[in-house]
Amino acid sequence: MTLMDPLANALTNIRNNEIRGNVKCRITPASKLIGRVLRTMQKEGYIGEFEYVDDGRAGKFIVELEGNINHCGVIKPRHAVKKDEFEKFEKRYLPAKNFGIIIVSTPEGIMTHKEAKDRGIGGRLLAYVY
């Protein structure tokens, strides 16, 4: 079976394991994009530690869940956003102002929308977490 969107699959896997109350979650296949999104989620306190395991195929991530995620998902289509347009998408994807994060791919790397606003750069919206 081919995956059309591995990032969407990873976030759905995390959300389903959070709902079930599991402590750990396995994400396959692993990719650099998924690893950077996980690092951003970890930095914001939504997940605990995670590690990459090379299984001889595509690899996988083992993620420790903390129970801090109410909902997460990808943003499709991946909107291109200028530095002053983040508020419109905050209203669309997040339940309240200053609650949750939107993960953005920028020329300076993957970061939250708050960091991108502070640095004054735009990018493409990847996912949301709250």
Swiss-Prot record:
UniProt KW keywords: Ribonucleoprotein, Ribosomal protein, RNA-binding, rRNA-binding
InterPro entries xrefs: Ribosomal_uS8, Ribosomal_uS8_CS, Ribosomal_uS8_sf
A Gene Ontology cellular-component term: ribonucleoprotein complex
BP GO annotations: translation
Keyword rRNA-binding set for record: yes
Keyword flag DNA damage: no
Lineage: superkingdom: Archaea
Any Pfam family matching the protein: Ribosomal_S8
GO molecular function, one term: structural constituent of ribosome
Family: Belongs to the universal ribosomal protein uS8 family.
Role, per record: One of the primary rRNA binding proteins, it binds directly to 16S rRNA central domain where it helps coordinate assembly of the platform of the 30S subunit.
PANTHER family: 40S RIBOSOMAL PROTEIN S15A (PTHR11758)
UniProt subunit comment: Part of the 30S ribosomal subunit.
NCBIfam families: PRK04034.1
Name under which the protein is recorded: Small ribosomal subunit protein uS8
